[in-house]
Amino acid sequence: MPKQKTHRASAKRFKRTGNGGLKRFRAYTSHRFHGKTVKQRRQLRKSSMVSKGDFKRIRRMVATMR
């Protein structure tokens, strides 16, 4: 059986945390900031964790990633 390869696009978008979680960057950060409040823009700068529902699927894609 062949080895499972890392999904390279996913590996570039997610980072492993020390506890084994997955960190991701937020959406809605590329343009059209004039329609967002200062508070929204500030909060969009922070990264967030992958939700439990998506974690299993994404973990399989980036299985070999450290």
Swiss-Prot record:
Record's keyword annotation contains Lipid biosynthesis: no
Residue ranges, compositional bias (Basic residues): 1-16
Matching Pfam families: Ribosomal_L35p
Molecular-function GO terms, alphabetical: structural constituent of ribosome
GO annotation (BP), single: translation
GO CC term, one of those recorded: cytosolic large ribosomal subunit
Keywords per UniProt: Ribonucleoprotein, Ribosomal protein
InterPro entries the UniProt entry points to: Ribosomal_bL35, Ribosomal_bL35-like, Ribosomal_bL35_CS, Ribosomal_bL35_sf
UniProt record similarity statement: Belongs to the bacterial ribosomal protein bL35 family.
HAMAP family on file: Ribosomal_bL35 (MF_00514)
NCBIfam families: rpmI_bact
The protein's name in its UniProt record: Large ribosomal subunit protein bL35
Source organism of the structure: Lactococcus lactis subsp. lactis (strain IL1403)
Lineage of the organism: Bacteria, Bacillati, Bacillota, Bacilli, Lactobacillales
